Amino acid sequence: ECRYLFGGCKTTADCCKHLGCKFRDKYCAWDFTFS
């Protein structure tokens, strides 16, 4: 199960598609991709 926007994360793999882990803040943020 992936983490949605602003969900807690340890790595980008924790986040849903088009989201990447912001390591400093430890949450998933949009990675600026669409496809």
Curated annotation (Swiss-Prot):
Q: Where are the transmembrane segments?
A: none
Q: Name one Pfam family in it.
A: Toxin_12
Q: What is its main location?
A: secreted
Report the GO terms under cellular component.
extracellular region
This entry's Gene Ontology molecular function terms read: ion channel inhibitor activity; potassium channel regulator activity; toxin activity
Cell compartment(s), UniProt: Secreted
Q: Which terms are listed as keywords in the entry?
A: Disulfide bond, Ion channel impairing toxin, Knottin, Neurotoxin, Potassium channel impairing toxin, Secreted, Toxin, Voltage-gated potassium channel impairing toxin
- According to UniProt, where does the site described as Involved in active face lie? 30
Which tissues is it found in, per the record? Expressed by the venom gland.
| Protein name (record) | Kappa-theraphotoxin-Gr1b
User: What species was this sequence derived from?
Assistant: Grammostola rosea
